[in-house]
Every structure is written in C-alpha cells, then in structure tokens.
Amino acid sequence: MYPTLENIKQLAQKKEYRRIPLCRELYADRYTPVEVMRTLRKASRHCYLLESASQTEVWGRYSFLGYEPSMEITCTDGTLKIRRTDAQGKAEETVKQVTHPGDTLREIIREYKTPVMENMPPFTGGLVGYFSYDYIKYSEPKLKLEDKEQQDFRDMDLMLFDQVIVFDHFKQKVLLITGVMTDDLEASYEVAVKKLEEMAQLIRNGEHMEFEPLKLESEIRPKFPKEKYADMVEKAKHYIKEGDIFQVVLSNPMRAKATGSLFDTYRVLRATNPSPYMFYFSSDDIELAGASPETLAKLENGTLSTFPLAGTRPRGKTREEDKALEEGLLKDEKELAEHNMLVDLGRNDIGKISKIGTVKVEKYLCVERFSHVMHLGSTVTGIIRDDKDAVDAVDAILPAGTLSGAPKFRACQIIEELEQSKRGIYGGAIGYLDFAGNLDTCIAIRLVYKKNGEICIRSGAGIVADSVPEKEFQECCNKARAVVQAIEQAQEGLE
C-alpha cells in the first residue's frame, strides 16, 4: 500500500491539497476488466469502464473502472441537481437554477484537490460522465436549442468517483485507489485502508451480474431516408453558397426499440473496433457504449490538446486497396479543404484560453486507420492561461468543429433548423475531469445509447460547397456500420 502515512502527512503539510490518493495493488492474472465490470454493476447501478487502444491496435496501458459514486451532478436547461450519497447509502438531493454549471464543478474539484502522483496512473479520482452537444448553450447563451422530440436529455451528467479500480496492463496489476482527506488525516487514512480492503474483497468474492442480452424489438431505421437527407444537404449547400458558413456537419439518427443491456455491444466494440477512447457508462437515466477515435479536449499539466479528424474513406479489403484509398484521400481537394477548415477552427478554439504564441499544429494530415474507416488527423496544442482551467477548456472547444462546422455558432443554428431533434450525447464529450485539474474527453461519436426503451446510433457527414448528397448519406452509414454490426453480433449471444 502506498504512499505511507508519513509520506501522506508530508504532502498534507503543504496545505495545498485536500485529498491524497492511497493505492493498493493486486495481481491481475485472475481478473479482467469485463469480469470486474460484472461485479461492479451488481454492486451499483452507477458505474463506468474506460479503456483505450492506439490506431495500430496496440492495447492501451490502463483500463479504469468505477462504481458507487458519492455524488452525481446533472444540469438540464439551467436546473442543476446534486445528489450526494453517504457511506450508509443514504441520498440527499439539492436543486438550484444556474446560468452556467461551471462554477459548481470548480467548487467540487477544489473541495477534493489532489496532487499528481508520479507512481500512479493519470486518473486517481474525479468526475466521470458526459457533456451533451447541447451544453454549448451555457457558453453561447444566444444559441437557442429546443427538445423538439421531448427526449429529456440532460445537458451534463457527471459522477464523483473517489474510489477507482485501474488495470495496469503493462505491470499486470490491478490498482485499487481511494482518497485520504487531509482535514482529519489519521481518521481518514484508517477509513481509506478499510475501503481498499472492501474493494479487494469485492473483486475477489463479489457476486457477478449477468447482463440481460440486448434484444431489438424493431428494425434499426434512420430518421432521414436518403431522399430527405439529400434535401438537408442541398439546404446546407445553399447556406454555404450564400456565405453563411463554409462547412456544416449534418447527422442522421438511427433508432430501434430494444430491451436488455448494451454491455455485450461494448464487448464486441472493444474487440472489433479498438479505438483511443472506449467506454461503457451506466446510470439511472441512460446506458451507453462506444469506441470513439477522436479526442475533444485533453488538458495535462497546463497543455491543452485537440485532435481534429476530418476526411474519411472506408478501409480496403486488401493492403493494396487500403493504400489506394489512402492515396485518394490525400489527393481529394474536398476532403483536404474540409480538414484544413477544421484545423483552423481547432486553433481558434484552443486560442480562446491559451497564452499568446503557444498555439501550434504539431502533427498535420496524418492518416489514422480504424476498423471500418480511415481519417485525416491533425494535432493542435496550446498552453492555457493561468486564469483558465478544465471547465474553460470544455467551454472553448465543445462541440468540436468536426461535429458542428465553421463558423461554429452559425453552423449550430443551421443544425438546429435542419435536424429537428436534440442531439443529446452525440457530438458532446465523454470522459473525466480529475481532482488534479486535468481533463481527458473524447468526442461522443461511434456510440450507441439506450434510453426510454430505445437505442440510438447517430452519425454525421461534413457538408461543403461541392458535397454530393448521396455520398454524404453513405458516409453516415459507413460511420455507423461498426456500431450496428456490434449490436447485431451482441444479439446473437457471446460466449
């Protein structure tokens, strides 16, 4: 178990931190993240699993799991709700009206301020969950977004996890982490030691939850058939011709009635579509599973990064075909123009909160391959100003230009007009804000969510002046294919 009580006392003497992470290690050869997730879901309805793989399909070092959040913070149309759960499981909810939930998030993060520990994973506790696409209303209050289909999406749903289970795949260890609060240090240390033992016992001996298999009760159908989507593209091209925008992303939701869980869908996605951001999230409101290729915002020790992906081709069936598709992508003027626009937008977004002269494009026009598609990718970074933080980073970048358009504000207005439905999680952000002030979120794409007895997969295409409507409709289908196939395979049953 580390750090020692003496080391914790030394850190606490600095009066800078409210919480110090305490870690206990188990050997991982008896466990898997999927198996442990079954145990956690039995213990708590509110739980998550975050994993990653590189574009070369090399498995990421860490898998993060959490359960039994001590707090859930949600915000919908300015109504902020905080539900606190004590050690005995008793819940208490407070409700208030806010113009922006960010101040409340900052207060909570300050309450648990934690040092970055060199010998621990990058995430040792924090807020995990999502910001919806519609969260933009708080940074852009003049943008009017309506819930025309009455799906009752939350603008934000974040849960505070003080206890974290981490699979370190390099060391082949399971790391159990909880926090020691510095205001009553010795008593808190004893509580933390006891909590780590409870976590170890849960992993060793906890009862498994058998997730109910997903069963579709209707066919997965797009909201907009090809003809209707083509009309939307033509209207968007009219706005481009008139000079309102340069580019806009129009999405097409696919829905079906369904029962059961999305966990097996997640299991298929992690095997067939390994991605930099893979996630399973369960709450009393929604269940979601996905494998996103694209970072929305990553803030680490003051450096803010975003990684726009724009420009798409399907993967080839042979190595030669794949190479030919890559060469075609790199020569496609429409795709290159779209990508350059969105790199510029990423620079502008990061520049809003960065120190002058620090914004730069570190990687440019790299071809990133995934299971079903390849994309053009670039990396934009900046060093944030001293008066800015992770909450400001979300405000500055959400929604990404790759999911909205350029100029962003007008593109969002046109999306609202043409799509005629609240996007909800799609195009938002999924990930964490940790107690050290860092942030790691992906763009909420390549996912399926289940809410109110219905599943939804949503995908979009970037519309520019010379877009061909039928090709843009097909691009939406290509992007949704990995998730649809995962759902179909999960329905057949997994061993």
Regions found by a protein language model. Name each.
Residues 1-495:
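Extended alpha-helical targeting/anchoring segments
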